[in-house]
Swiss-Prot record:
It is found in: Cytoplasm. Pfam families: GTP_EFTU, GTP_EFTU_D2, GTP_EFTU_D3. GO terms for molecular function: GTP binding; GTPase activity; translation elongation factor activity. It catalyses: GTP + H2O = GDP + phosphate + H(+). The gene is tuf1. NCBIfam families: EF-Tu (TIGR00485), PRK00049.1 (NF000766), PRK12735.1 (NF009372), PRK12736.1 (NF009373), small_GTP (TIGR00231). Keywords: Cytoplasm, Elongation factor, GTP-binding, Hydrolase, Magnesium, Metal-binding, Nucleotide-binding, Protein biosynthesis. Residues 19-26 are annotated as: G1. It comes from Roseiflexus castenholzii (strain DSM 13941 / HLO8). This is Elongation factor Tu 1. Monomer. GTP hydrolase that promotes the GTP-dependent binding of aminoacyl-tRNA to the A-site of ribosomes during protein biosynthesis. InterPro entries: EF-Tu_GTP-bd, EF-Tu_GTPase, EFTu-like_2, EFTU_2, G_TR_CS, P-loop_NTPase, Small_GTP-bd, T_Tr_GTP-bd_dom. Its EC number is 3.6.5.3. Residues 60-64 are annotated as: G2.
Length: 401
């Protein structure tokens, strides 16, 4: 059966839910699809379908990242539901990297919690441009003053992390009430908070300026072998565009020269696409490439547009203990993981002359040597991780090869 064609009629925006475990991110995601489905602007996706990470289903903790799609009158949205559990912050980094804007979900009775702070910090690090807040479970609070205090605390938290806390919209509501309602009337009072939220997302999160005219680049997130058709790589196009017949290179994660291949198809949401452009989440079918010849962490790029490098200088901020960072300094030769685009790569650190150690809270320029070359360029941002947590955030200042 021929696949449906994806029609591009509205601006496309990537959003996602972030926040502390059990504050209602997945319930809200399901509720959005339910309410918009009443307008014919989405397909309802249930809580269980979103929370479909079987090994963790028992504890009700979301681990995998789930993509849903929906529309408003103004835009077409791809929405990722991000894991809230600290162990899966790594997934959070891959998810948040895909956001033009975030919906921060905070349970009103609990207020901001450690993971709320960590997610806001990460959103800042991976440069999520804008955020709206959904203050959930307000039906469990009958004290208006307490609600206002929680809002105040949230605005302060956002401001402290470089977001405009005073102007960010905070929508109050109950995701569960909207999700469990049996009403088919879009004007039912329990649905109003969802409509208000989508309105805030439409109005407050800017339509991103896509880097369509730059050379094509897509970080590879996943690789699939399709019998009889070849190998498909998936990811979000960072810049440029790609269509069937284009020659591309697979760059990085190897000491060998980049491999050239030809694109034999592009798909989005299981529909064929004439051309994938910056900002799209796509699958790209590659000619003559074995499933084993390509891996997560590599990039697909216009030939010659980006090269793999192992050594670079970087400006790095080392998180304080209070921000979830290290409690102790580190020294030259420290070998953490560098989280670059879609993968962790081990690297060794050299410090500038006269610097003997780096304290939590320091800003420092360092020289990094990765164990394997990766597609990098000046201005690229990355996280430094150790033992499953973020200990620093950096930006590449110069390539040294």
């Amino acid at each position: 059966m021929a696949k449906q064609k994806f029609e591009r009629t509205k601006p496309h925006v990537n959003v996602g839910t972030i926040g502390h475990v059990d504050h209602g991110k997945t319930t809200l995601t399901a509720a959005i699809t339910k309410v918009l489905a009443l307008q014919g602007a989405a397909q309802f996706v249930s809580y269980d379908q979103i929370d479909n990470a079987p090994e963790e289903r028992a504890r009700g903790i979301t681990i995998a990242i789930r993509h849903v799609e929906y529309q408003t009158a103004k835009r077409h949205y791809a929405h990722v539901d991000c894991p809230g559990h600290a162990d899966y912050i790594k997934n959070m980094i891959t998810g948040a990297a895909q956001m033009d804007g975030a919906i921060l979900v905070v349970s009103a009775p609990d207020g901001p919690m450690p993971q709320t702070r960590e997610h806001v910090l990460l959103a800042r690090q991976v440069q999520v441009p804008a955020m709206v807040v959904f203050l959930n479970k307000v039906d469990m609070m009958d004290d208006e003053e307490l609600l206002e205090l929680v809002e105040l605390e949230l605005r302060e938290l956002l401001s402290n992390h470089g977001f405009p806390g005073d102007e960010i919209p905070i929508i109050r509501g109950s995701a569960l009430a909207a999700l469990s309602s049996t009403s088919t009337d879009i004007n039912a009072p329990e649905y109003q908070c969802i409509l208000d939220l989508m309105n805030a997302v439409d109005e407050y999160i800017p339509t991103p300026v896509r880097e369509v005219d730059k050379p094509f680049l897509m970080p590879i997130e996943d690789v699939f072998g399709i019998k009889g058709r070849g190998t498909v790589v998936t990811g979000r196009i960072e810049r440029g565009k790609v269509k069937m017949g284009d020659t591309v290179e697979i760059v990085g994660m190897s000491h060998e020269a980049p491999k050239k291949t030809v694109v034999t198809g592009v798909e989005m949401f299981q529909k064929t696409l004439d051309e994938g452009i910056a900002g799209d989440n796509v699958g790209v079918l590659l000619r003559g490439i074995e499933r084993t010849e390509v891996e997560r962490g590599q990039v697909l790029a216009a030939p010659g547009s980006i090269k793999p490098h192992a050594k670079f200088k970087a400006n790095v901020y080392v998180l304080k203990k209070e921000e979830g960072g290290r409690h102790t300094p580190f020294f030259p030769g420290y070998r953490p993981q560098f989280y670059i685009r879609t993968t962790d790569v081990t690297g060794a650190i050299s410090l500038p002359a006269g610097v003997e150690m780096v304290m939590p809270g320091d800003n420092i320029e360092m020289l990094v040597e990765l164990i394997v070359p990766v597609a990098i360029e000046e201005g690229l941002r990355f996280a430094i991780r150790e033992g499953g947590r973020t200990v620093g955030a950096g930006v590449v200042s110069a390539i040294v090869d």
